Amino acid sequence: MVSTTTFLMLTSIATLTSARSHLTVTIGSNCTLKGPQGGHVFWWRIYDNGWFTKPCDQPGRFFCNGRDLTIINVTANDKGFYYGTDYKSSLDYNIIVLPSTTPAPRKTTFSSSSAANNTISNPTFTALLKRTVNNSTTISTSTISIIAVVTIGISILVFTITYYTCCYKKDEHKGDPLLRFDI
């Protein structure tokens, strides 16, 4: 039972993280993040402490053309998570920055998901994401994986209860004498 639960947890974590694009770039290079194909894309830079910024509001460091985001002259401070959405679909990127002496591996882009830093608090960003989900016509990979894990967990629980009630036979002679009422 414990090994099954561990397997399910690891599978769901792998499903959640597989949707994010991981890009490795070197210091001093330029990096372009492709946005969703829909309308105008809004980009967010997400920090580990829950704050986020709009990179397009910093024209010297970033270039936005309405869909793509280009990080100009990448520095070590540019590592982290970038989130682009057109409120119908979204893409997430995890930027890993290497020193310029280390050659960067080729860019590999997968389908993406979420991540955040600005002077606006985390609840505001959560409200923004809720609005994004409400306007979306597709279900994200993370939502599907969470639903699958919950369904499997409930199935295991129902199976365990059914097994206990059907297969456990109580010996008639063993019983608590205080609970017997032989009159």
Swiss-Prot record:
InterPro entries: Adeno_E3_CR1, Adeno_E3_CR2, Ig-like_dom_sf
Glycan-carrying positions: 30, 73, 117, 134-135
Domain of life of the native organism: Viruses
Lipoprotein listed as a keyword: no
Keywords: Early protein, Glycoprotein
Family listed: Belongs to the adenoviridae E3_20 family.
Record's protein name: Early E3 20.2 kDa glycoprotein
